[in-house]
Amino acid sequence: MSFATINRSATKALSASIPAIEDAFAAEPSLKKRVYDAIESTPQHVPLFEDIAKYTSSLLARHANPPTQPVEADEGPAAKKRKLQNGNVAGDTQSSGDVKAEAPLQFYMQDVSFAIPQRKKLTLEVTAGRGYLRARNQTSKEVEFGVPMDRIRHVLCLPVPEKSQRQFNFCIIPQYSDGINPPPEGEQVFESMVWTVSDGPAKAAFSGNGQQVGTGDGETAEALVRRVLNENLSHTKVVRPDERQFVSAMPEAHRKAEKAYHVKAFRGSKEGYLFFLSTGIFFGFKKPLIFFAFENIESVSYTSVLQRTFNLNIAVRPHNGDENETQEFELSMIDQADYAGIDAYIKKHGLQDASLAEARRAKRYNINGAKAEEDAAGTASDNAAEESELQKAQRELEDQEDEDEEDYDPGSDGESDGSGSSSEEGEDGDEEGDEDDEGQDLVAAELGSEAEDVAEDEL
C-alpha cells in the first residue's frame, strides 16, 4: 500500500510539470485538472495527453489575431513591400505575426545552413499540429521567416551539384512563389526557402520535448527531414530526382561513381541548374527560383541547336491566366550530351505538344506520392505515344529545316549565330556552318561534274 501511494505521488508530481499541458489549458483550470486526474489514473497515456495539449496550443496560436502593420496602397512596388513585410496584407487569414507567434514544436534542428531567403545558419522548426515551417535566429531567438504548412505547394529534395561531399538542398516553394503564377491582388505571399543538409546522421535534431532524434538508428539527416516534412505537409509530398524520369549523361563532377541528376544552364547571364522531376522542371538555386509545374507548361521547344550546346524554351501559362496569356523562358547553353535524355523526358510527358496543355491542367499533378508519380508518368507517356507517324515525320522534317536555317548563313562573314552569350558557342556555330558549307559545295561540284559528263555523251 505504501509503495502504491509513493508511486502515485511521483506520477502526480511528474504530470504537474508537463509544460505542454500547462500552456494548452492555462485558461481552463478545471479542464487541466481533469487531464491531470486522467494521467494519474493511466500514466501510460502521458504521451497522448501531451500530444493533445500541443495540438490545442497550435490551434490557439493559429486562430489568434495579433496586430498587423497597415499597408499603404501607394507605398512602393508590390515586390518590395512583400519583401519588407513578408506579404502581410490586411484581411489575410494568415499573417507573419501568426508565423512568428509562440507555438509548441514537433521538431527542430539547429545549425541549419539556409541559402534563401537569407544566407545564414538558423534553427529549422516545425510547429505541432501541421502548423508552420519556420527558421529561428540562434542568437536573438526571434523567428526570421516561415510559411504555413497548408500554403506549401512544392517541396524538392535535390542533391547539391559539384560538391566533393554529398549534400542535399531542400527547396520549399509556397503558393504563388514558383516564379510562374502571380498572386491575386491583396493575396499574401510567403517567400521560398532553401536549406542544405549534409549526408550522414543529424547532429542537432530534436523532437518537440527536447529529446534528440536521428542518432543511432541509421537514419540520415536528409531522410529525417524528409520524413518530418511528409508527416506534416497537407497538399504535397517531398519530390526527389528519379532516374526513371531523367539522369544526366555525365556523372557528378567530383564523385565520378555517382549519377548526376542536374543539367547546367543559363537564364540570361544567371547560371543555375535544371532538374527534370516527376512533377515538373526546376531551375535553381539562386533567386528567383523557378518551378515549371506540368499543369503550367504550354509547350517546350529547342532553339540554337549547335554542335555542343542548345537552348530550351519553355512556354507557360499561369493558373489564372487567359488562353493568350503565355510567357516564354529561355534556358541556354545546355550541353549537347544531355539532349537525348531531356528530349526523352519531354516526349514522355508530352510537353512538346501544346495541344496536350489542357489535359495537363485538368490532370493537375497535385499529389506527388510514389504511386501518383508512376501513374502520371504512364498517362503522359500514353498521350505522347498517340502522335501519328505522319505528324512525327512532319515534325522531324520541320526540325531538320530549322537546324539547316540556323547552321547555314551564306552572308555571315564570321558573325556568331545563336544567342551570342558565349564565344565558345559562336565558334561551334561557325565550325558547324563551315562543315555544312563544305558539304554543300561537294554536292554541287558532284552534280555539276555529272551534268558535264551527260552533255559530252549526248554530243
Swiss-Prot record:
Superkingdom in the source lineage: Eukaryota
Region listing for Disordered, in residue ranges: 64-96, 370-459
Family statement drawn from the similarity comment of this UniProt entry: Belongs to the RTT106 family.
Residue ranges, compositional bias (Polar residues): 85-96
GO cellular component: chromosome; nucleus
Bias kind Acidic residues: ranges: 398-416, 424-440, 449-459
Subunit structure comment from the entry: Interacts with histones H3 and H4.
Classification via InterPro entries: PH-like_dom_sf, RTT106/SPT16-like_middle_dom, RTT106/SSRP1_HistChap/FACT
Compartments where found: Nucleus; Chromosome
Gene source species: Neosartorya fischeri (strain ATCC 1020 / DSM 3700 / CBS 544.65 / FGSC A1164 / JCM 1740 / NRRL 181 / WB 181)
Name of this protein: Histone chaperone rtt106
GO molecular function ontology, one term from the record: DNA binding
Functional summary from the UniProt entry: Histones H3 and H4 chaperone involved in the nucleosome formation and heterochromatin silencing. Required for the deposition of H3K56ac-carrying H3-H4 complex onto newly-replicated DNA. Plays a role in the transcriptional regulation of the cell-cycle dependent histone genes by creating a repressive structure at the core histone gene promoter.
Keywords from the UniProt entry: Chaperone, Chromosome, DNA-binding, Nucleus, Transcription, Transcription regulation
Signal peptide (from-to): none
